[in-house]
A protein has these predicted regions:
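Short helix-loop-beta junction
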Residues: 461-486
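Polysaccharide-binding and catalytic clefts of secreted carbohydrate-active enzymes
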Residues: 69-327, 345, 431
Length: 722
């Protein structure tokens, strides 16, 4: 077994001996610095590849302070304020950290700010309000009594939010606040290219420039107590300035409004059905950002080095699943791995030479402290991500943070050594091939490929009570035996043939969100295309409130193919008689007691006549199956990630595709164990996803079987005979 390569480790000025020891012990072939660390010159000649973290928009306060007009900006909205009798005064900075941002009253506020009557939805004419700089407040002289008002305004980011986050988490003392500057603007643009060349001249030993990241940070706001107030890992609200917005207006040919970004205070988060204006803005940003990225990567290449992009931080506009990214010149992607979905978020990116996953835990004091258990976190992270790696591998793994902290935990060092060796073996066995896929499935929502593997993700891989029952579907798919695609309603509208080759469509989420479509179902072309796909023999799985939008006598616009509807009160007058359960169904065959954990589930779902209810609780349908023409639909109220729910989804997809007969092909009877085949490479593996020993019967591709015992977390490799 190869015991060297494909691993990156962090270092620091005071960790040279530890770095040298772990280079050998973990078989690492690359070294990196991190935020808050420096690269020791003693390690230049180790033979390892050297990554240098490069901050395009910060770590140069001299420039930032000398050019305050080109500081980065964001749009922010005040809370709602209710008018009574007389004038209404709205303070702008309530609930916002003054360390983080300050009001931009330098640019024309009449053009770039907006006061909105939220009771009517109409903007207040600029003549009817004024700004008081001394109190940082907006006064509306004659508001409508008992109407609610907000102010949308531009603010300068005077402390980079990621640097603020790292400073707060690590309790850094007496650290100068790094001010982010806007590379899109003329002076800083020219300076940035010169600065990059000077950096490359003075760092000839660097092999890989690890851009962290490029130009615009995702939306991250803190309050006066330094608490996180608002976060959207996909948010574009900090990618704005009058300079950028004037360019946008010239391109699209219509006047910009702050509301295009503010979006009633929802900031166009991924649950909002995106407006035309917001999609136009994103497309504009992708083109502009990719062009500027290409300028920087061309410089890096001219010095004979590779350009790597960190998937996160200042990555807004990069959008690696969209075509503009392919023109950016990026050689490699590295990203943080929180689970299987975030692993696929990295490994599925097309057009780069290699991908790398930064595994958890990060070597920071929040985990590496007396009483901490970094081994447990490392095990959970590796075993969860391994499912996805076995479907679409990253090319490298790595860790980040303070190496000396990790070295205080010898059991952690032992475990990571085993992970590195296991990863190398895994990679050698599956590289260059596509694993066996039993079916092709497509997740259908408003975002499609742009949010591939990031559906239902508010912040990177963090749990939310309101969406874990939906995110679990994406997590299950990340390691399942399917070819997974992401399709948008716009894709279907543009070309219905996009569904050709798809076996099963999946629509997951709450009603009237971007994930289920909202008003798009009023478009007869979209509705008929999806229903026609199922009626002609396709499969459909709906989770939560699929197609949820009140229109023409239906709430669930996919009620016909799924055979269920939601009781909103409008149909209480109709009696419902279909309540018999059929728990002996193919989909439930592997479930303990033929029951399922639906997570938060859904209230008030009932079955239409002719629908087969699999599970109902107190006359609320949780799972149902339905024949629709030549096709089939499956309704599930929620499906949080678990090994048994992985199996439920697997069986549901096979049933929806009329392919129950293919169940015993590369299959384990124990749902805690999975089988992955790499036919081109003549290999297959059986993997125990749990922390306990497991016994199972394994079925191979020809339907033959054998019994197998696996130790905790164990993975066994076999050759495919014949």
């Amino acid at each position: 077994m190869n015991t060297k390569g494909r691993v990156t480790i962090p270092t620091d000025m005071d960790a040279v001996p530890e770095t040298l020891a772990l280079l050998k012990r973990w078989g690492a072939d690359a070294i990196r610095d991190c935020d808050g660390t420096e690269f020791p010159q003693e390690l230049k000649d180790t033979g390892a590849k050297i990554y240098a973290t490069y901050y395009t928009t910060r770590k140069d306060n001299a420039w930032a302070k000398a050019n305050p007009d080109e500081t980065q900006q964001c749009y922010i909205m005040t809370p709602f304020y209710t008018a009574a009798d007389g004038a209404l005064t709205i303070p702008l900075m309530t609930g916002i950290s003054r360390e983080l941002m300050k009001v931009n009253d330098h640019d024309d506020i009449a053009r770039w700010w907006e006061v909105i009557d939220r009771t009517t939805g109409e903007p207040v004419p600029t003549a009817d309000w004024h700004y008081d700089a001394a109190s940082e407040s907006v006064a509306i002289d004659a508001p409508a009594a008992y109407h609610e008002y907000t102010v949308s305004f531009l603010a300068y980011l005077i402390w980079d939010p990621v640097h603020m986050y790292n400073s707060v988490i690590n309790d850094w003392k007496d650290v100068e606040h790094q001010i982010p500057f806007d590379v899109r603007q003329p002076k800083t643009h020219a300076y940035t290219m010169r600065r990059l060349r000077e950096y490359l001249e003075s760092h000839p030993y660097v092999n890989v420039v690890r851009f962290t990241t490029f130009f615009h940070l995702f939306t991250l706001v803190f309050d006066e107590l330094r608490r996180e107030k608002y976060v959207d890992w996909y948010g574009y609200s900090a990618s704005v300035s009058p300079y950028i917005l004037e360019q946008f207006e010239k391109e699209v040919g219509y006047k910009f409004r702050p509301e295009f970004i503010i979006d009633q205070g929802y900031y166009n988060n991924q649950y909002r059905v995106p407006s035309k204006e917001y999609k136009d803005f994103q497309a504009f940003q992708r083109r502009e950002v990719a062009g500027l990225m290409k300028e920087m990567t061309d410089i890096v290449h001219a010095y004979g080095k590779e350009a790597m992009m960190f998937l996160g931080d200042h990555w807004i506009g990069c959008e690696p699943f969209m075509p503009e990214f392919q023109k950016s010149g990026v050689d490699a992607i590295v990203g943080s791995v929180g689970n299987g979905s975030t692993l696929r978020l990295i490994s599925d990116i097309p057009g780069v030479k290699y991908t790398e996953g930064r595994f958890l835990p990060y070597f920071f004091p929040d985990t590496f402290h007396e009483g901490g258990d970094p081994v447990r976190e490392a095990k959970e992270n590796w075993v969860t991500a391994r499912r996805a790696i076995l479907r679409k591998p990253i090319d490298r793994i790595g860790y980040g943070g303070y190496l000396k902290l990790a070295c205080e935990f010898p059991e952690f060092l032992d475990y990571v050594e085993s992970v590195c060796n296991e990863f190398r073996e895994l990679y050698e066995n599956i590289k260059g091939t596509t694993p066996y896929c039993v079916k092709t499935v497509a997740v259908l929502n408003s975002w499609g490929q742009q949010r591939a593997w990031g559906c239902h993700m508010v912040h990177h891989a963090l749990y939310q009570k309101q969406n874990y029952s939906y995110a679990g579907v994406i997590e299950a798919l990340s390691g399942a035996l399917f070819d997974v695609k992401f399709i948008s309603f716009d894709d279907i509208k543009a070309d219905p043939k996009v569904l050709d080759g798809i076996d099963v469509l999946i629509n997951v989420g709450d009603g009237d969100t971007a994930h289920t479509g909202g008003k798009v179902w009023e478009d007869p072309d979209v509705s008929a295309t999806v229903k026609g796909f199922v009626h002609r023999g396709g499969g459909l799985i709906g989770v939560g409130e699929p197609g949820g939008h009140q229109y023409q006598g239906r709430y669930l616009q996919l009620a016909a193919p799924l055979g269920v509807e939601k009781e909103t009160g409008f149909t209480l007058n109709y009696d419902k008689y279909n309540w018999d359960e059929h728990r002996d169904h193919f989909i439930l065959a592997d479930c303990p007691d033929h029951d399922v954990d639906f997570g938060e589930g859904k209230k008030s779902i009932f079955a239409l006549e002719g629908t087969e209810i699999l599970i109902q609780r107190d006359k609320e349908v949780q799972m149902a199956a339905h024949e629709y023409g030549q096709g089939r639909g499956v309704y599930i109220s929620g499906l949080p990630y678990s090994f048994v729910n992985n199996r439920v989804l697997y069986r549901a997809i096979l049933w929806a595709a009329h392919d129950e007969a293919d169940l015993h092909k590369w299959f384990s009877t124990n749902y805690n164990v999975e089988v992955h085949a790499y036919v081109k490479n003549g290999k297959y593996c059986v993997v125990n996803n749990t922390y306990e020993p497991q016994d199972t019967t394994v079925y191979t591709g020809d339907g033959s079987s054998f019994d197998l015992h696996l130790d905790a977390n164990e993975i066994k490799w076999y050759s495919i005979e014949g």
